[in-house]
Amino acid sequence: MIANKITINKIQNGTATIEVTFSKFKLADANKKDFVLEVKDSANDDASAISATELVFDANKKILTGKLNGLASNINYKISKFTLNNNEIKFDFKQEDQQELLNQYIQQAELNTIIDKANKKINIKLQNFSILNSFQDNQPVLTFDIEINKKDGITQVVHKSLTKNQLLNPNGLEIDLKDKMKNNIDYWTLAYVVWFLAI
């Protein structure tokens, strides 16, 4: 058995629905399907595992769905155990599948921006964003453009990237834009952020 896609919906009241799609699925006994799926805090090996409940397998679509209860939105979870009839299930993620999974995390996130016009700074904080544990601490995870329009219609673009550590910073990421704005005091009529995946 090989799983090649995972979908996790937004955590609400500590509960999320998980969906696993299989690219390869074959059983000697079609009537025996004992799935076990557990997740745990990726940063704490001693944390208790959370077992998925209400697991239902659709043989035609090769999709397993279930519920995860007792989740915290500020914790990055990893799959600690995934078996079928006591046999470990392997994962085979393609690049586009990894990107789609990360997109799901981004869609769940809340992006907060605080603009300090006087000091020409912007603070960006991403909340409710569980980062995949496969990323390294200093690996760029997201890149984005800050577009600042001048009153004369010319747009100044600042390109930045966020690492895993920066995304986990509870104070957000502060970006100093003095160098980009030093020759024109008419900046800050409009500012917004456009996000891209870095993988």
Curated annotation (Swiss-Prot):
InterPro entries, A to Z: DUF1410 (IPR009849)
State the source organism's domain of life. Answer: Bacteria
**What does the sequence similarity comment in the record state about its family?**
To U.parvum UU376.
> What name has this protein been given in UniProt?
Uncharacterized protein UU171
| Source species of the chain | Ureaplasma parvum serovar 3 (strain ATCC 700970)
Q: What is the lineage of its organism?
A: Bacteria, Bacillati, Mycoplasmatota, Mycoplasmoidales, Mycoplasmoidaceae
